[in-house]
Amino acid sequence: MINKDIYQALQQLIPNEKIKVDEPLKRYTYTKTGGNADFYITPTKNVEVQAVVKYAYQNEIPVTYLGNGSNIIIREGGIRGIVISLLSLDHIEVSDDAIIAGSGAAIIDVSRVARDYALTGLEFACGIPGSIGGAVYMNAGAYGGEVKDCIDYALCVNEQGSLVKLTTKELELDYRNSIIQKEHLVVLEAAFTLAPGKMTEIQAKMDDLTERRESKQPLEYPSCGSVFQRPPGHFAGKLIQDSNLQGHRIGGVEVSTKHAGFMVNVDNGTATDYENLIHYVQKTVKEKFGIELNREVRIIGEHPKES
């Protein structure tokens, strides 16, 4: 049952066209799975995010944030409370050797803007399918580069709706981790300090990384990206491959035969299929090698109700 009081309160804080009720979230995830959100809002201004977060905090209403849904699994039971999509906070500005980008801007697009201005440092991100907010949240990286290498600061909002500006040091960026996760903050925008370079060399590096990515990753299927973090001294994909799990399927989801670190939706798979396959892979690798595989992908939402 959707709470009409919450709906009416949201209408006072944000234009009605930015509010959706009982919205299917599978429309917004790379896996094409997920239940409905009680309220799904799409703010276009930082102050709108702040206002909604402050209202939710004061009224003890849970808030969930979504970027472009590339490294997340949403259960079929959906998400209660308010889901805030940050995708419309997608501005990208260039000033000298710095780029400021909104949380919803695709990090791929930001890397391309950097190239167009002959700025080097974001080439590693040319194939990462996440948003700026998600990239900072998990210190995204690929092919030897990571957000930590070039970020200057992040402007965030806390659980009370107040703005917090964090420097690189204050962000405590580590392998797939940050203070943002620990303090339950959300990124509104981030600034990156880059270096002058040659556009032809930057493009050549991006072309090389794109070719490597396309040749190794199962981009032809819906997926949640890299499922597991890299265990110290090992590669998750190699452990899964050596456990003979490539091609193993539960429901409509299988361990990719192209890259064992990915799970792909090959036949109308569900979030439950993903979650069950993840647990099975973790259990199998643990039994065979004694190594715990920790998830890189986030799993959120409620389990579906049993019929």
Curated annotation (Swiss-Prot):
GO terms for molecular function: FAD binding; UDP-N-acetylmuramate dehydrogenase activity. The keyword Signal does not apply. One of its GO terms (cellular component) is cytosol. It comes from the Bacteria. The active site is at R176, S226 (proton donor), E296. It catalyses: UDP-N-acetyl-alpha-D-muramate + NADP(+) = UDP-N-acetyl-3-O-(1-carboxyvinyl)-alpha-D-glucosamine + NADPH + H(+). Its cofactor is FAD. NCBIfam families: murB, PRK13905.1. This is UDP-N-acetylenolpyruvoylglucosamine reductase. It comes from Staphylococcus aureus (strain MRSA252). The gene is murB.
